[in-house]
Design a protein with these regions (language model features):
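Phosphate-group recognition and catalysis centered on beta-loop-alpha active-site segments
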Residues: 1-272
Length: 272
């Protein structure tokens, strides 16, 4: 009997640890009401209309004029400017080698997006274009302490005077933690996916949302293919809002609408 009690105590302790690690924010941020049923154009409405590369001003305008929320990605440049761009490197979208964070804004403005005449926009240019017409989901692209705090600080300096609605999210828990500490008024989210086969214990911890104790996110944005992840479901059960990414077809977009009240899509235009 004592052995059984010991086992139960150990299991209870493990459960308590998991709950502590996975628990989202205790609060219910008022902006979660906006996220309920919200659909978001991934990097703007790109790949649908001519001459609208991802994360470009035309792609943002195409979404905004249709009343569709927009997901954007932001990096910090070598000279401390905040630009809207997804990849860490420039080869896929600009056809040149190089790391975006090693370039100055001036150097980046000489490049073109996806073989078009459009340039890499700054965060300021994006905000001026959207001007509060639709909500923005801003992903902070950082993977290290070297860029995390500078990016968060620089972006916040720009965003603090923005009158429109925005949410922040990141795969990097310290970036979400920065907003937890310094901008409690902003609805913050932890991005994740099923990285169980990736090398590194930190990737497995991210997949299981075991780093939530750092950021206590208001919502969890998870790759929809891994909807059944028990840790994701536990986090939602504990009170996190559920957001899913990235849907590329109408069938799955509709299929997972209940599991993910907020859905990010690309390569098609959802039916109204």
């Amino acid at each position: 009997m004592q052995f059984l009690y010991a086992i139960l105590i150990v299991l209870a302790a493990l459960l308590a640890i998991v709950l502590f690690l996975v628990f989202p924010a205790l609060r219910r941020h008022p902006d979660r009401k906006i996220m309920q049923g919200l659909i978001i154009a991934h990097r703007g409405l790109h790949s649908i209309f001519k001459d609208t590369p991802e994360n470009s001003l035309p792609a943002f305008e195409a979404a905004a004029e249709r009343g569709i929320a927009i997901e954007i990605d932001i990096h910090i440049t070598r000279d401390g400017e905040v630009v809207v761009f997804h990849d860490d490197t420039l080869d896929r979208m600009c056809g040149v080698s190089g790391i975006i964070e090693d370039k100055t804004l001036g150097e980046l403005k000489e490049l073109s997006l996806g073989g078009t005449n459009h340039k890499i926009p700054t965060l300021t240019e994006c905000l001026e274009l959207v001007n509060g017409r639709v909500p923005l989901m801003i992903e902070f692209k950082t993977k290290s302490p070297k860029t995390c705090v500078p990016l968060c600080r620089a972006a916040n300096e720009i965003l603090k005077n923005y009158k429109g609605k925005y949410f922040m999210q990141s795969f990097y828990p310290p970036a979400v933690m920065w907003y937890r500490r310094h901008r409690k008024d902003i609805c913050r989210g932890q991005l994740s996916s099923g990285y169980f086969k990736e090398k590194g214990i930190h990737m497995k911890a991210l997949s299981c949302l075991l780093l939530n104790f750092l950021s206590r996110p208001d919502f969890v944005a998870y790759e929809y293919k891994y909807e059944s992840n028990p840790f994701r479901r536990l986090c939602v059960l504990l009170g996190a809002h559920s957001s899913g990414w990235t849907f590329t077809d109408e069938e799955n977009f509709e299929k997972y609408s209940k599991a993910f009240p907020t859905r990010t899509f690309e390569k098609f235009l959802p039916k109204e």
